[in-house]
Amino acid sequence: MRGHDVLPRQHRALYARCSVQVTAHLLARVAQLRIFGDDAGKMNRSLLDTGGAALAISQFTLYGDARGQRRPSFVQAAPPELGKNLYEEFVRVLEDFGVTVATGVFQAHMSVDLTNEGPVTILLDSENTF
């Protein structure tokens, strides 16, 4: 099935900084982002347009900071309990938009196989306006 591989990262201060409206806006973007080809091959179709799904795999390592050191620091990542709550909310809201979501197991070591059409990588961040 075609879809998005979504790697949500959970910041330790996300609840304090990120409103429900911002989170909903980002997830609407995930569902509505037109990055799948239309009949002419132009990026013009979204997950909702194609009936695609999302694979949501929690990725605290995206907060790994290796500046000036040989081992990354993960102090900006949410602690496990908060991270799990944020991840579950992320999945629930995305499903509320009508997207089928497959999930990984939170805090588990997983082997994930995917075929990437692209290369296309898009960053959506509630901290930055692009």
Where in this protein do the model-derived segments appear?
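Beta-rich nucleic-acid/ligand-interaction surfaces
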Residues: 108-113
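Short, low-complexity, polybasic intrinsically disordered segments
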Residues: 74-77, 117-130
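Residue-level signal for inorganic ion chemistry
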Residues: 26, 57, 120
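A short, glycine/Asx- and small/polar-enriched loop/turn
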Residues: 52, 114-119
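Flexible glycine-/small-residue-rich
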Residues: 14, 58-59, 114-116, 124-126
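Compact, glycine-rich, soluble single-domain proteins
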Residues: 9-51, 61-92, 96-97, 102
